[in-house]
UniProtKB/Swiss-Prot annotation:
Role noted for this protein: Minor structural protein that acts as an endoribonuclease during lytic infection. Degrades host mRNAs in the cytoplasm by cutting them at preferred sites, including some in regions of translation initiation.
Signal peptide: none
GO BP terms, alphabetized: symbiont-mediated degradation of host mRNA; symbiont-mediated suppression of host gene expression
Record GO terms (molecular function): endonuclease activity; RNA binding
Main EC class the enzyme belongs to: hydrolase
Gene: 17
Protein name as catalogued: Virion host shutoff protein
Keywords, comma-separated and alphabetical: Decay of host mRNAs by virus, Endonuclease, Eukaryotic host gene expression shutoff by virus, Host gene expression shutoff by virus, Host mRNA suppression by virus, Host-virus interaction, Hydrolase, Nuclease, RNA-binding, Virion
Length: 455
């Protein structure tokens, strides 16, 4: 997930900065929350692998969600939750979709191109069907609803395919869920996963703003919220968001939350955003296999980038065959204050008002000519990223379509009903609901928060 080795790189080079509280009292900072990324991160922290035996799955899910909402409230963050698609159909956009189409290509009578993609000596090429991607195609409104019918709401919506456990549950007290002995045999440890539909239902009925990413990946929806100036940060540990030019919030637990800004990373590397796309697309884990995947540190060494901590050791590797045309990266080693080939100053990214992705389309001019299936995949992915992060030009206007944000009116009855069907006990459900009401205030309307923050 993300760029291989980028998380280690940003920590080793101290690119993770504590967030500075700059909003006045009463003004909330809107953040996009990659729900499943954050929830599973909390699951790993609250319930280490050795302590997950005999746990009640719904209680663990409710506990993690309660901790998340409490943290966001304490840090004055206003979350817009990005929910992953609930359908079983394939994704239509993104790295996984591009890779899937290439692997299923049947141009030469075979549907398995794994051998072709992994072979470095093959001369076979894949004809990727290029599409003119715009926000109308990438972020189109979907008619698919994640809310099941009324007759299935009491069963499928809350069970999420997992067997029910015993009703001996212990309520959430002091952010702890006690262990529970299950009377059913374990089948693949179902309690080691979160109950996705339960979590999504609680988010809806508690009145939080949310986005349903139906046929796109959640990180693309988060990037759209960031580049449309809807949110100030994206709460996730997925470094793909940095690749998409976003600023990410890694953890909401510390008082001064750690933040990584894309402009700081670009300024540290001394390159522009188009050069960043071209150089580090080889590090994308969803697009490459272990045989052709490169780490961030390997790309820095092979392309000759001179970061501040390696000014006297970084040299270009003559054996790096994937970058056959070295002249493409002449601009990668220029000083931070200098100009690049396309006349864009790297130093402009130091400004808080700068938009790092404004010249993203220049990356297509920096890409070397495609001569292998892997080159075609990388070009297709870069084209897709450009379509996600850049606006659509209409004459003198530049328009960027925002994903559809929904917000239901808070319904305490439906919250209790959702808890009741998962906990099989009205008393326990009301106890959970009372704790939510006591520690987590009802969310404000989305437009009110956005107006106060951005104005």
């Amino acid at each position: 997930m993300g760029l291989f080795g980028l998380t280690r790189f940003i920590h080793e080079h101290k690119l993770v900065k504590p967030s500075i509280i700059s909003t006045p009292p009463g003004v909330l900072t809107p953040v996009a929350v990659d729900v499943w990324n954050v929830m599973y991160t909390l699951l790993e922290r609250l319930y280490p692998v050795g302590k997950r035996e005999n746990l009640h799955g719904p209680s663990v899910t409710i506990h993690c969600l309660g901790v998340l909402l409490r943290l966001l409230t304490q840090r004055s963050y206003y979350p817009i939750f990005v929910l992953e698609r609930c359908t079983d159909g394939p994704l239509s956009r993104g790295a996984k979709a591009i890779m899937s189409r290439a692997m299923n290509h049947d141009e030469r009578g075979t549907s398995d191109l794994t051998r072709v993609l992994l072979s470095s000596n093959t001369s076979c090429s894949i004809k990727y069907n290029k599409t003119s991607e715009t926000y109308d195609s990438v972020f189109r409104n979907s008619s698919t609803s994640c809310i099941p019918s009324e007759e299935n709401k009491s069963q499928d919506m809350f069970l999420d395919g997992c067997p029910r456990q015993t009703d001996k549950t212990i309520c959430l007290r002091d952010q702890n869920v006690c262990s529970l002995t299950s009377t059913m045999p374990s089948r693949g440890h179902p309690n080691h996963r979160l109950y996705h539909k339960l979590c999504a239902s609680l988010i809806r009925w508690m009145g939080y703003a949310y986005v349903e990413a139906v046929d796109i990946e959640a990180d693309e929806a988060c990037a759209n919220l960031f580049h449309t100036r809807t949110v100030a940060l994206v709460y996730t540990t997925d470094t793909d968001l940095l690749f998409m030019g976003c600023d990410i919030l890694l953890d909401a637990i510390p008082m001064f939350a750690p933040v990584v800004r894309c402009r700081d990373l670009l300024q540290y590397l001394g390159i522009t955003y188009p050069e960043f796309l071209v150089a580090f697309v080889r590090c994308q884990t969803d697009l490459h296999t272990s045989d052709n995947l490169k780490s961030v540190q390997q790309v820095i060494q092979d392309t000759g980038l001179k970061v501040p901590h390696q000014m006297d050791t970084s040299t270009r590797s003559p054996t790096y065959d994937s970058w056959r045309h070295g002249e493409v990266f002449k601009s990668l080693t220029v000083a931070t204050s200098g100009k690049t080939e396309n006349g864009v100053s790297v130093s402009k990214y130091a400004s808080n008002r700068s938009e790092v992705t404004v010249d993203a389309s220049w990356a297509l001019n920096l890409l070397p000519p495609s001569s292998s299936p892997l080159d075609n995949l990388e070009r297709a992915f870069v084209e897709h990223i450009i379509a996600v992060v850049t606006p659509l030009t209409r004459g003198r206007l530049k328009l960027m379509k925002r994903v559809n944000i929904m917000q239901n009116t808070a319904d305490p009855y439906m919250v209790i009903n959702t808890l009741y069907h998962n906990l099989k006990g009205e008393k326990m459900a009301r106890q959970y609901a009372r704790i939510f009401k006591q520690f987590i205030p009802t969310p404000l309307p989305l437009n009110t928060v956005l107006t106060k923050y951005w104005n």
